[in-house]
Amino acid sequence: MEIGILDIKGSLPLFEDFGNLPTKIITENNYKEIKDLDALIIPGGSLIESKSLNDDLKKEIINFNGYIIGICSGFQILAKKIDIGRKSSVPIIKEGLGLLDVEFSPLVCTDRVEFEVKKSIFGEGKGEGFHCHTYGNIEVVDKETKILTVSKVKKLNYKLGAEKEIISGAFKGKVFGTMVHNFLDNEFVRDNFLKHLGVTEDEKEEIFEKNKIIKDELKKRALKYRLNPKLLKENNKKDVNKKRGIILLATSSNSGKTFLTTALSSKLNGRVFVAKIGGDVRDIVPALYLLREKMTKYNSIKIGERGWVDVSKFLDYIKKSDYDYIIVEGVMGAFTAALKNISSYQIAKKLGFPVYIVSACNISGIEGAFVEAMAYYSLLKDIGIKVEGVILNKVYDWNSFNKLKSLAEKHNIKLYGVGKIANESRGLIPEVEIDYESFCRNAFNVDLEIEIPEVEINNHIKDEEDNFLERLDNWMENINKY
């Protein structure tokens, strides 16, 4: 029994376990072996945006007579058409393989979900998983294509509302697709599929053993190690009790937190865990792509009703883990929604990790970005946050930056600069359209080395609200003293 997993540019073959079913890695080099498989799993990623499937690979998949299971982007590639034109004045239509009579259009969903499997080779019943997509609105355009999964979601296009059901999967003949990540990790789904294939218990164990081997191989092929092979040789855990961590908080949205999270992840020698404050886990997928790490419920820290696990559960998980570094990415600006007690700074205070303030120079100029960062620096320190330093992103004038750096050093403030990307196209914008390979390669090329301090993890969190208005009042009193 051979079950292939497609490992090509833009794919996420370790984003989930896929039921521990894959036994063979399929790449651009051995794609002709697809015909010998019993089944092929096409994982999520940025397969559409990365233009990853060449004509020969497409032909091999179309002519394959075994079972095909596409997850998220792997499902989209099986469809007829995909409109990736989010925030575009006109649709941007990409052609799929046409194996499923389905069309996609923009719909953002990053929920953990309960889904229902309709009667199929996977059985029928309810399971759990998560959505992580930008264009997930599904229209089934032919009666021969049947609905495979329906998901219950509460948040669509960033808006929380009453729970509703959306079509999340479809199938036709031997071709199956779903937007639900962890679909195959539901035991009943996996076991019904294996039963349909006539797999015995002994064969099942053989599959699992093969899967362990290819997971190790897939990990070694992570982009991080391909870009810097030395890190693979040196990637040894020295002390399970010592962990280093930071939180990236910004002065506003679109400051480049995701880009910097990915850049930092590419440099560190050791196991890196990335997490997002709030529910938009799409922001950390580039780092997970680079690292070839799995998305778990602990990668999203709950803020209000958005996100997956609360702070104490996150810290408990981290404390018991064998990760060397923890990088937490904030949501929007550090103080956004602080009056409602659902801001990034309030989560940062509970986490107790040191903070770097990110301020982008493309809106109010390099001088304005520095002044904004200093205001955030001052207020966060007043509140009791450990502020480690400031990162000015999208720097366009290094002469001006160096003057500001000298000034910051005079006042014992660490200031770092990251240059502006030459061409920030749609494929480099996480919330719109992203090519993971290009995004991560750009991030790897960033010259950024910051100190990531050792952290003491205290998972006994006091459940108390921080009075932001009072904090602000005290801070403003100090301002008026001048």
Curated annotation (Swiss-Prot):
NCBIfam families given in the database record: PRK06278.1 (NF004921)
Pfam families with a match to the protein in the record: CbiA (PF01656), GATase_3 (PF07685)
Recorded GO CC terms: cytosol; glutaminase complex
Keywords: Glutamine amidotransferase, Transferase
InterPro entries named in the record: Class_I_gatase-like (IPR029062), CobQ/CobB/MinD/ParA_Nub-bd_dom (IPR002586), CobQ_GATase1 (IPR033949), GATase_3 (IPR011698), P-loop_NTPase (IPR027417), PdxT/SNO (IPR002161)
Protein name: Putative glutamine amidotransferase-like protein MJ0138
Domain Glutamine amidotransferase type-1 stretches: 1-203
PROSITE patterns per record: GATASE_TYPE_1
GO function terms (MF aspect): glutaminase activity; transferase activity
Example of a GO biological process term: pyridoxal phosphate biosynthetic process
Magnesium listed as a keyword: no
Organism of origin: Methanocaldococcus jannaschii (strain ATCC 43067 / DSM 2661 / JAL-1 / JCM 10045 / NBRC 100440)
PANTHER family given in the database record: PYRIDOXAL 5'-PHOSPHATE SYNTHASE SUBUNIT SNO, PYRIDOXAL 5'-PHOSPHATE SYNTHASE SUBUNIT SNO1-RELATED
